[in-house]
């Protein structure tokens, strides 16, 4: 697959790049994508949820009333799960949600995600550019020139660029990261994937 390289003004630069078929033209493995995305979202969970049982809740050492003669059901503690202020039966306890996915499955999922975007025509390549200072306005202008100002965009750079990353931090519709850091979820959670030209080589090195 070939794509025309765009300038920051949104025009064609006259240059053409060839996307590798094994990364951008592969058969989409929905199961690999499912496993990887499920793992990514599960691993984000902290698992710090906790409720107290009747043994942990404060108080309740005293018998609320005598055993016999009141007409009520017998009670041994004011912190019984049946009473207001009592402990919780089978409540949540802290535990991890981590799910392991093999490296080959992760790589297959990322290739599937890129291939899906390529099939839908949602991959753009822009010439390598740099910003002189951290400012949102010039970066927003570039997105507008490319027709991405109102679309959820994942922008991939060849390496971490603090100026570009921080310039786009205030723009809610754009997510900027170095190419090798992009996960399957990041790719699928965007409308368009915008590559800086040099970032394509990084992807080929990572997934090739």
UniProtKB/Swiss-Prot annotation:
Region described as Disordered: spans on this chain: 45-96
Biased composition (Polar residues): 69-80
Gene Ontology BP, a term: translation
A GO MF label: rRNA binding
Record keywords, A-Z: Ribonucleoprotein, Ribosomal protein, RNA-binding, rRNA-binding
InterPro entries per the UniProt record, alphabetical: Ribosomal_uL4, Ribosomal_uL4-like, Ribosomal_uL4_dom_sf
GO CC field: ribonucleoprotein complex; ribosome
Function field: One of the primary rRNA binding proteins, this protein initially binds near the 5'-end of the 23S rRNA. It is important during the early stages of 50S assembly. It makes multiple contacts with different domains of the 23S rRNA in the assembled 50S subunit and ribosome.
Subunit structure, as described in the record: Part of the 50S ribosomal subunit.
Homology family: Belongs to the universal ribosomal protein uL4 family.
Full protein name: Large ribosomal subunit protein uL4
Protein source organism: Chlorobium phaeovibrioides (strain DSM 265 / 1930) (Prosthecochloris vibrioformis (strain DSM 265))
Record lineage: Bacteria, Pseudomonadati, Chlorobiota, Chlorobiia, Chlorobiales
């Amino acid at each position: 697959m070939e794509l025309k390289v765009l300038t920051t003004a949104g025009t064609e630069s006259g240059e053409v790049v060839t996307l590798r078929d094994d990364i951008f033209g592969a058969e989409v493995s929905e199961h690999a994508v499912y496993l990887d995305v499920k793992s990514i979202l599960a691993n984000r969970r902290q698992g710090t949820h906790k409720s107290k049982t009747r043994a942990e809740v404060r108080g309740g050492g005293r018998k609320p009333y005598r055993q016999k003669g009141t007409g009520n059901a017998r009670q041994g503690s004011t912190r019984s799960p049946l009473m207001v202020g009592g402990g919780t039966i089978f409540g949540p306890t802290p535990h991890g949600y981590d799910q392991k996915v093999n490296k080959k499955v992760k790589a297959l999922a990322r290739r599937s995600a890129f291939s899906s975007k390529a099939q839908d025509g949602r991959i753009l390549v822009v010439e390598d550019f740099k910003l002189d200072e951290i400012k949102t306005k010039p970066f927003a202008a570039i997105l507008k020139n490319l027709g991405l100002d109102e679309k959820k965009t994942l922008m991939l750079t060849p390496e971490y660029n603090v100026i570009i990353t921080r310039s786009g931090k205030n723009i809610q519709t754009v997510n900027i990261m170095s190419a090798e850091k992009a996960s399957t979820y990041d790719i699928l959670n965007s409308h368009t994937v915008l590559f800086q030209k040099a970032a394509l080589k990084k992807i080929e090195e990572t997934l090739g």
